[in-house]
């Protein structure tokens, strides 16, 4: 409800001395509506959009640093949701879905702290998928696993997951 009122105020009184604060508070209100990572993140995307617009419009504002911190927090929540979705697919043995979700995660969140684990899980998913496959396609799927292992080794030669990946 507060988000609506701040949005309305900012729209109607855009020349007011409080318009800047109203725009920030609109984004902040959306941020407060953002649920835990396991739920739909539509409010998080909306908050990121509004707060990014705020930063673009008022980069020198006293609220700009807070807005940046909130955006970073919301992005971490979205990253975690995507990563946990991939792990859930793996847990229920939906290996192809887990692989696709991990590929999307790697592409969409290149600077994530979870990248290394995502690369490792790609190997694990390829391996588990190959083992669960019929014999006629197993060799191709194990080759995919080897390819992913090599890519992992190139990117993370000193990984904490290296011992497990070699198995």
Model feature map: region roles:
Residues 1-167:
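Acidic, polar-rich low-complexity tracts and alpha-helical solenoid repeat scaffolds
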């Amino acid at each position: 409800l507060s988000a609506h009122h701040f949005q309305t105020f900012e729209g109607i009184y855009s020349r007011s001395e409080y318009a800047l604060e109203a725009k920030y508070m609109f984004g902040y209100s959306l941020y407060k509506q953002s649920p835990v990572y396991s739920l739909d993140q539509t409010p998080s995307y909306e908050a990121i959009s509004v707060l990014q617009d705020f930063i673009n419009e008022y980069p020198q504002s006293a609220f700009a640093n807070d807005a940046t911190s909130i955006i970073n927090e919301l992005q971490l929540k979205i990253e975690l949701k995507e990563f946990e979705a991939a792990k859930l697919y793996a847990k229920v043995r939906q290996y192809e879905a887990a692989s696709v979700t991990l590929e999307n995660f790697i592409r969409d969140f290149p600077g994530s702290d979870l990248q290394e684990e995502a690369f490792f899980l790609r190997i694990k998913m390829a391996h588990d998928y190959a083992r669960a496959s019929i014999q006629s396609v197993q060799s191709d799927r194990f080759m995919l696993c080897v390819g992913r292992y090599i890519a992992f080794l190139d990117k993370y030669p000193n990984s904490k997951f290296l011992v497990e990946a070699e198995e």
